[in-house]
A protein has these predicted regions:
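Active-site loop/helix belt of alpha/beta enzymes
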Residues: 5-6, 40-57, 111-126, 133-257, ...
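Short hydrophobic/aromatic-enriched beta-strand-loop microsegments
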Residues: 79-88, 102-106, 124-130, 230-231
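C-terminal helical cap(s) of enzyme catalytic domains, especially alpha/beta-barrels
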Residues: 14, 71-77, 242-251, 359
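Conserved, mostly hydrophobic/aromatic
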Residues: 17, 39, 73, 107, ...
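A structural signal for short, hydrophobic beta-strand segments that form beta-sheets
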Residues: 84, 258, 314-315
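C-terminal accessory subdomain/extension
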Residues: 263-388
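Flexible, glycine/charged-enriched surface loops at secondary-structure junctions
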Residues: 31, 206-210, 214, 349-356
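A charged N-terminal "starter" segment
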Residues: 1-102, 116, 164, 371, ...
């Protein structure tokens, strides 16, 4: 691993994860379950290691986006309940039961097929009913035009013998935005959510064990809507405006090292396409990180990185495996020096804004060839979170 670290790596600070978890817990209260969203390999941080730490510190649930992600967690020994947020084909019912996965259901037809298959297999599937309150995606539609039909279908779902109906949830689309229009729409979504729950529970006499609607934006701005559980996604990883406002700490730091330094006269081109020419006699350092590692090519000639002696501008097009930085004003920089691409000092969200995207995308883009190095209680740990 040491030889690999001399190239490019991602440091995952599990102490920062713990800090962020506790900030959320204090914000929503001790009685609310915290669900850790670990889909997309834990937003690029490593789903297994993140899930194991969340299990240690008191998370009540996890969430994934597909059945393979759930299987990876179960194979690693994770025992927490796991909610599959999206679509799973009904022909995967046997795997769902085997993995003890909680499945979201978004229509009567899919719910009935799950129920029928579960009964045939001699089992019962735990499910959460998904409500579409304005996202325009999966879920029973709760707008005025479809409300009554969705209510009837949900009441029918409650009667399916092969399902154990545990929860109900929805997803906010603009809860992270504070414009008047966005605030009003988020309030409308919550009103629709609460109204459907009230109608279902009143007419059926059934009570969902878990009600959840708050994502990162909901947690930060509407903690009074925490219900029984909140879903901690990007905010848990300490990235974005909301995380910064709440005092979260970045969990991932993407780092590399200076491979070599070359001297150039003024007017010399750097990298593909000759998009950058040196403006003066310059010292240009080569970093062994490129877009195949997850450093977006769209960030070429835009970002700064942090050396041990200060910030340096990235220059020229980012290549597949390398990029260049201008260290003319940092004469102390030398080959082997550690460089932060983003992390505690260079915020991922700031880089994301430069290429018109969100920090989720940049973190998820950090590729498999970049080793993740985990730290807990200030020391490096292995995949079982034991000190190395």
């Amino acid at each position: 691993m040491e030889s690999t670290l001399k190239r490019t790596w991602a440091e995952i600070d599990l102490d920062h994860l713990t800090h962020n978890f506790e900030v959320i817990r204090r914000h929503v209260g001790d009685k609310v379950k915290l669900l850790g969203v670990v889909k997309a390999d834990g937003y690029g941080h490593g789903a297994v290691e993140i899930a194991k730490r969340l299990e240690q510190i008191g998370a009540g649930y996890l969430a994934v986006s597909n059945i393979d992600e759930c299987e990876e967690l179960r194979d690693s020994g994770v025992t927490l309940p796991i909610l599959m947020l999206g679509f799973t084909p009904a022909d995967q019912t046997a795997r769902i039961l085997q993995l003890h996965m909680t499945q979201a259901v978004q229509s009567y037809d899919i719910a009935k097929e799950f129920s029928d298959r579960a009964i045939a297999l001699g089992g019962k599937m735990t499910v959460h009913v998904k409500l579409d309150t304005g996202m325009g995606r999966l879920g029973f539609s709760c707008d005025e035009a479809h409300f009554d039909a969705s209510l009837r279908d949900i009441l029918r779902v409650l009667e399916l013998p092969g399902l154990d109906i545990e929860g109900v949830f929805t997803h906010f689309s603009v809860s992270d935005e504070d414009t008047a229009e966005s605030v009003e729409f988020t309030k409308l979504q919550h009103e629709r959510f609460a109204r459907m729950i009230e109608k279902v529970e009143t007419q059926s006499g059934f009570r969902f064990q878990l009600h959840h609607c708050c994502n990162a934006g909901g947690i930060a701005s509407y903690p009074e809507w925490a219900w029984d559980m909140v879903r901690c996604g990007i905010i848990l990883y300490g990235s974005g405006d909301l995380a910064e406002k709440m005092g979260m700490q970045p969990v991932m730091s993407l780092k590399t090292r200076v491979a070599t330094i070359k001297d150039f006269a003024a007017g010399e081109p750097i990298s593909y396409g000759r998009t950058y020419f040196t403006q003066r006699p310059s010292r240009i350092a080569v970093l062994p990180i490129g877009y195949a590692d997850g450093l977006h090519r769209a960030l070429s000639n835009q970002i700064e990185v942090l050396t041990p002696y200060g910030r340096a501008k990235q220059v020229g097009r980012i290549c597949m495996d390398m990029c260049m930085i201008d260290v003319t004003d940092l004469p102390q920089v030398k080959s082997g020096d550690e460089v932060e691409i983003f992390g505690e000092h260079i915020l991922c969200a700031d880089d994301a804004a430069l290429c018109d995207t969100i920090p989720y995308e940049l973190m998820c883009a950090v590729s498999k060839r970049v080793p993740r190095v985990y730290r807990l209680n200030g020391v490096s740990v292995d995949k079982n979170l034991q000190p190395l």
